[in-house]
């Protein structure tokens, strides 16, 4: 297979065994922390109503459904296995895994309000990650390790699997980009504010991602193509947040 889209054969098998056979929350017993940058581009009109409604409102998209890609650039991060008592995997802890400098992307399809569940999700993990770090990221971003992403485990109804890919993140003059060759060409640009050179922000939010969001839109031909989907989010709602997450 193309190395840019190859499946994480060993890691995904381990991840699925832990997640579906043991059916335990936080199967690796991870304690984790991630600081970095979060990008999202969806098919809603600018501005998506999820941040203000906390995911309760019907998407303000042409079809009432939410299609999106998410990108997480981890500037600093770690995951650590900590066993106390019951250990379903019957092995020693792998200790601290460095997640700094890695990228993660998500393809997400939601049939209605974000908080109503029924998600179809595909996960993409940086090929630079070690197998242990990839396992940890799969557990974190499937919601099994608690923290800010913990609610994902209640929302995901159809998991499309994990792919390890070359993933790049860049900050541009007018926005940000997230790229996976042959899959994601994600580009967003911030909306200009009243004051020249200033961006539009929404602050003091209870939103799960972060309390402050920079309002953005999809740049020309911002799109994702995978798992039978071909979505173009040019002009669609987008957001950028600086994130500081931890779990459980």
What residues fall within each predicted segment?
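Residue-level detector of short, conserved catalytic/binding motifs and their immediate flanks
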Residues: 12, 42, 121
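Short, flexible beta-strand-to-coil junctions
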Residues: 18, 75-77, 180-185
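N-terminal ordered "arm"
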Residues: 26-79
